[in-house]
Regions:
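Active-site proximal loop and beta-alpha junction motif in alpha/beta enzyme cores
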Residues: 1-244
Length: 244
């Protein structure tokens, strides 16, 4: 069994929720293209990050079916875990900073995968949306408080299989901040929080809370003890790690 960590990215103020990402710190343990795809698929998580050079911050991001040149939550999770000042991705160099309870990165909107940003009249309308049919990746959003830059959002990947809705997504929030040219505080899913703000030279800052619990290599899901996610602010939710 290969060691890996699970992080929750874009946690809410209580330390709960967030997007679950797997991080393999020793990327040399999974080098083959098909092996990485299979590992990411078996994880059952949004994405898996393989750290190919921890000193330089070189990472490789995989979803269940493809390589991702850049993705917000995986980059934030890996940066927080490695305490890295920057990450090197296929899309480019991602600047990183830690600011108290939040981890921030700077990225170019052009790096983000395409998303359909669909505005609705109210948060209640967003909350009442059914899952759209398979097709385009839809980021549904509405103003909670336009003056304060507060947004309510949900993310629908549009896949015919797998996740119908993601708890939190950084790339779509980054694209929305770029479109609106302003800082945003977004509540997504059941209670995740995503922060964005325009930055220098056309970059956009993306920030959120990251919580960690480390997996135990070699134990199966049937025998591995439950683990507790989060920092002292967390709500002590318990999960079982996946058997990879």
């Amino acid at each position: 069994m290969i060691g890996y960590d699970i992080v929750r990215v874009f946690c809410g103020p209580d330390g709960d929720h967030g997007d679950r990402i797997a991080v393999v710190r020793d990327g040399s343990a999974v080098t083959g293209e098909q092996d990485r795809v299979a590992f990411a698929r078996r994880s059952g998580l949004t994405a898996t990050v393989f750290v190919d050079d921890p000193e330089r911050g070189v990472i490789d991001i995989r979803s269940a079916d493809r390589r991702l040149p850049f993705a917000g939550a995986p980059c934030l999770g890996a940066a927080w875990l490695l305490d890295a000042p920057e990450l090197i991705t296929p899309a480019g160099v991602v600047g990183v900073r830690l600011d108290g309870e939040f981890t921030w990165l700077e990225a170019r909107p052009a790096w983000a995968p395409p998303r359909t940003l669909r505005q609705y009249d109210s948060p209640e309308e967003v909350d009442a949306l059914p899952v759209p049919p398979p097709g385009e990746w839809v980021y549904a959003w509405a103003w909670e408080d336009e003056g304060a830059g507060r947004v309510r959002a949900r993310g629908f990947p549009g896949r015919g299989h797998g996740a119908e809705e993601v708890e939190a997504t950084g790339s779509a929030a980054l694209l929305l901040a770029d479109r609106l040219h302003r800082a945003l505080n977004t509540s997504q899913g059941r209670g995740s929080q995503v922060l964005t703000a325009p930055a220098r030279d056309g970059l956009v800052e993306l920030g959120g809370r990251v919580h960690l619990d480390r997996a135990v290599p070699g134990a199966s899901a049937a025998t591995r003890p439950a683990i507790t996610l989060g920092s002292p602010a967390s709500s002590r939710r318990r999960i079982h790690l996946l058997d990879l």
